[in-house]
Amino acid sequence: ELVEELKHELQGKIIIVNGDMENGVRNAKSVIERGVDAIISRGGTAYLLSQVYTRVPVIAIQIDALNILKTVRRIGEDKHIGFISYSNVIYQYQAMAEVLGVNKIPYFQFVDYGEEYRIEQFVQEAKEYGVDILIGGAHVQDYAKKYGISSVFLESGKDTVLKAIREAETAIIVRRKEQENLKIINDIVDHAYIGIVVFDKHCHVKKWNTTFLSMFPQLLQF
């Protein structure tokens, strides 16, 4: 919804695909394979997308401590709050809460990227701990509902979404420039009168021109 609101402020075409984690990757597959310049997501979904689509820049929307503090303020003072999220998100909140003296969350659990399967266990532990309401992402909400605990979705702020979009725009510009430079290099190699062979950082041959091949015709046997 937030991205829909921001679309009129942005240049370029933005395609919105709904989905979380594996569903998000699956739902985005057809759009990405038709051709996109960059992907923007957040949390574990961004991590999974970066593992699947290694040739496309994946920009993760960050959640800053201010978003978390705003979420905590919306929850009543008498609530026993639990927070399940990725370690970088929780560390941000803990650092700011310590400075401001507003730490109202007694139960924390850290999740590493790729270990989202542990979320259900953490939600069960939160219930046993006496947590009234959980803060977290979509997976936390799903399991909280399953175990009868109230939950609040940790939203990204407008500023963090805009920042991710700007990062994506920069990544696209850099990538296009790299592609232009690569084309120039390929043209030079292809049309050079001397023999040229190109190696990657692992010393594997990636490209050679016809002049080089005429000097070493035995390479045609490989």
Model-predicted regions and their roles:
Residues H202-S214:
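PAS/LOV sensory domain surfaces, especially short acidic/polar patches at coil-to-helix junctions
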Residues N23-G35, R118-V131:
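Short, well-structured alpha-helical segments in soluble
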Residues L2-K7, N18-R26, L48, V56-V99, ...:
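Ser/Thr/Gly-rich flexible loops in soluble cytosolic domains mediating phosphotransfer, phosphorylation
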Residues L10, G35, I39, L48-L49, ...:
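Carboxylate-rich, polar loop motifs that coordinate divalent cations or form catalytic acidic clusters
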Residues K177-V205:
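Sensory modules in modular signal-transduction proteins
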Residues V36-G43, G82-I84, V131-H139:
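Periplasmic-binding protein-like
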Residues A28-I61:
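Helix-enriched interaction subdomains in cytosolic or periplasmic regions
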Residues F216-Q218, F222:
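Glycine-centered C-terminal helix-capping/turn motifs at helix ends
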